[in-house]
């Protein structure tokens, strides 16, 4: 059904937007249904259709749905906040993590003062800093992931954690497959 | 930048084109950092980045470029989840920290509530002390009365037989009053038990 191009089915949102014929085997059709034209419009504006085609072709078929959903999420964030995009959301979450960690440390110190120790009191700090300077709070805060964009299947952390190799926990970033690629100067 | 003698920016070098004076990429992609533009070009495309930058005021373009570079790096590292992987991970961290904080705060509240009943117990001890003192005062009264009266029935004042047979006498009345006074603190004490 997704890849059929007979007259009974509408073209996918991508082919409709690009004004081209939706062929059988169209790589966009399974992920951009015609009733969600806005989703493709955002992805096309930010990433470009040819770039997305290349990206999807490099992935296994069972990974493409998650990839499209994450691209759509990032594209929407970029459209909402053209300056900071997803980095605004990441900076906001990082500040939340730091603030909560401080509050938890203070609460555990109070518990230690009362002479009681709990399992939480002994828990080590678990904060991982991204290699990015915190940005000012974006004027338009991005809401949490909504159901449309929620990643299906196992969470990225669960998917990638077992593949991490070597290095202490502090240097392992659960969302980068454990690879130690050199990024840009940030 | 631009003009003869200077190097083209990293983007014009990669795209093999002439770097004009008003090149929109030149301020943000210096020739000594070619990887920065290469990765942005791979993920977003040069024309898309150019359009995005043109839509922004000049003073915001540097931040926009930095965030695009960050997101491009995340996408290349993780082609499936990109930045959403980082966001999802951080959201999980926030949730876990919030739960741990709630548990710790609940334990602190329990300890503080445990300290409050202890004060009540101390108050009860004070009450018992008062009862004891009242009993002592009554005993002193008994001794004083008996000493003042020089009553021959001193050793038998509490005897019910003596009490009944001497009901009408003044000394019997006094003994009866003392007994009634003594019973009050005992009743009061039993209320606390």
UniProtKB/Swiss-Prot annotation, chain A:
It comes from the Eukaryota. Residues 10-111 form the LOB domain. GO terms for molecular function: transcription cis-regulatory region binding. Induction: Positively regulated within the shoot apex by both ASYMMETRIC LEAVES 1 (AS1) and ASYMMETRIC LEAVES 2 (AS2/LBD6) and by KNAT1. Disulfide bonds: none annotated. Pfam families: LOB. PROSITE patterns: LOB. Keywords: Developmental protein. Belongs to the LOB domain-containing protein family. Expressed in a band of cells at the adaxial base of all lateral organs formed from the shoot apical meristem and at the base of lateral roots. Not known; ectopic expression of LOB leads to alterations in the size and shape of leaves and floral organs and causes male and female sterility. One of its GO terms (biological process) is organ boundary specification between lateral organs and the meristem. This is Protein LATERAL ORGAN BOUNDARIES.
From Swiss-Prot, chain B:
Expressed predominantly in roots, and at low levels in shoots, floral stems and open flowers. GO terms for molecular function: DNA binding. Coiled coil: none annotated. It holds the Pfam family LOB. InterPro entries: LOB (IPR004883). Residues 7-108 form the LOB domain. PROSITE patterns: LOB (PS50891). It comes from the Eukaryota. GO terms for biological process: leaf morphogenesis; shoot system morphogenesis. Belongs to the LOB domain-containing protein family. Gain-of-function mutant pck1-D (T-DNA tagging) shows highly epinastic leaves, reduced apical dominance and sterility. This is LOB domain-containing protein 12. The gene is LBD12.
């Amino acid at each position: 059904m997704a890849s059929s191009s007979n007259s009974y089915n509408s073209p996918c949102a991508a082919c409709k937007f690009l004004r081209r014929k939706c062929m059988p085997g169209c790589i966009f059709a399974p992920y951009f249904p015609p009733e969600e034209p806005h989703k493709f419009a955002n992805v096309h504006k930010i990433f470009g259709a040819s770039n997305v085609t290349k990206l999807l072709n490099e992935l296994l078929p069972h990974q493409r749905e998650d990839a499209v959903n994450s691209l759509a999420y990032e594209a929407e964030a970029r459209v909402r906040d053209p300056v900071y995009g997803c980095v605004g959301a990441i900076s906001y979450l990082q500040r939340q993590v730091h603030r909560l960690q401080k509050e938890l440390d203070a609460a555990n110190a109070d518990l230690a003062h009362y002479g009681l120790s709990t399992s939480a009191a002994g828990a080590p700090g678990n904060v991982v800093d991204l290699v990015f300077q915190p940005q000012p709070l974006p004027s338009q805060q991005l809401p949490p992931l909504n159901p449309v964009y929620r990643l299906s299947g196992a969470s990225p952390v669960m998917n990638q954690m077992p593949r991490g190799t070597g290095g202490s926990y502090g240097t392992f970033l659960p969302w980068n497959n454990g690879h130690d690629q050199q990024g840009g100067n940030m | 930048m631009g003009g003869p003698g200077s190097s083209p920016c990293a983007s014009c070098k990669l795209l093999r084109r002439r770097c004009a004076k008003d090149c929109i990429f030149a301020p943000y992609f210096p020739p000594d950092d070619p990887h920065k533009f290469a990765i942005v070009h791979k993920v977003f495309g040069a024309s898309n980045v150019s359009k995005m930058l043109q839509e922004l005021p000049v003073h915001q373009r540097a931040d926009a470029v930095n965030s695009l570079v960050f997101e491009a790096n995340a996408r290349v590292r993780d082609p499936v989840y990109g930045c959403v992987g980082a966001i999802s991970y951080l959201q999980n961290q926030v949730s876990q920290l919030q739960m741990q904080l709630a548990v710790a705060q609940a334990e602190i509240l329990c300890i503080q509530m445990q300290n409050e009943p202890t004060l009540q117990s101390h108050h009860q001890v004070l009450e018992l002390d008062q009862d004891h003192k009242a009993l002592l005062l009554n005993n002193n009264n008994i001794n004083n009365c008996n000493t003042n009266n020089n009553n021959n029935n001193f050793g038998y004042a509490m005897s019910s037989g003596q009490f009944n047979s001497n009901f009408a006498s003044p000394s019997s009345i006094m003994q009866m009053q003392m007994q009634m006074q003594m019973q009050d603190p005992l009743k009061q004490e039993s209320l606390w038990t």
